[in-house]
């Protein structure tokens, strides 16, 4: 299962784009010093970061990073993993209060696979901080810019 398939399955199941502002590949435009696989913003303004990991070594390497110790822009952090990595992801995530979404491989009649939320994350920062109401529209703008940037760069006739 590819990392992009993991993110797609998790987003469609738990962060449906009609109810959440969702954008993939977010970094500087959101104020992050690294690229997040996906960001989802709720109507209440809560920001969820989704990080897909498809290999145990990649999961362990990412977990050693300190990006969630100074959560300026992210309220909740989720690992999105294939079912084979569920136990290692839960073991790493639980002590830090991170969430885990496990995604099975797609079946014959299922394009994006089934996802099961296994571990709910704890807030990374104080929920009392008032978030700017411009966060959702700002993320939608980022998503639109990213979409058209990809369309312009994609060779003619190539499909996704």
Please give the residue ranges for each predicted region.
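Catalytic cores of nucleic-acid endonucleases
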Residues: 47-48, 53-103
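Anionic group-transfer/hydrolysis microenvironments
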Residues: 26, 39, 53
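Non-catalytic C-terminal interaction segments of nucleic acid-processing enzymes
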Residues: 1-14, 89-160
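A generic local structural motif
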Residues: 8-9, 37, 62-67
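A short acidic/basic microdomain associated with nuclease active sites
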Residues: 15-31
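Acidic-and-aromatic substrate-binding clefts and catalytic sites of carbohydrate-active enzymes
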Residues: 29-32, 58-60
């Amino acid at each position: 299962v590819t990392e992009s398939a993991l993110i797609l399955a998790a987003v469609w199941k738990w962060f449906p784009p009609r109810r959440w502002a969702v954008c993939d590949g977010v970094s500087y435009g959101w104020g992050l010093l690294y690229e997040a696989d996906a960001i989802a913003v709720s109507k209440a303004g809560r920001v969820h970061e989704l990080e897909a990991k498809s290999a145990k070594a990649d999961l362990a390497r990412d977990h050693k990073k300190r990006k969630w110790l100074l959560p300026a822009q992210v309220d909740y952090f989720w690992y999105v993993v294939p079912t084979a990595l569920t136990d290692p992801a839960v073991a790493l995530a639980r002590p830090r209060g991170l969430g885990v979404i496990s995604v099975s491989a797609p079946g014959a009649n299922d394009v994006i696979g089934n996802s099961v939320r296994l571990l709910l994350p704890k807030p990374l920062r104080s929920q009392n901080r008032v978030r700017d109401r411009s966060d959702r529209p700002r993320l939608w703008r980022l998503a639109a810019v990213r979409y058209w940037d990809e369309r312009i760069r994609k060779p003619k006739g190539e499909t996704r």
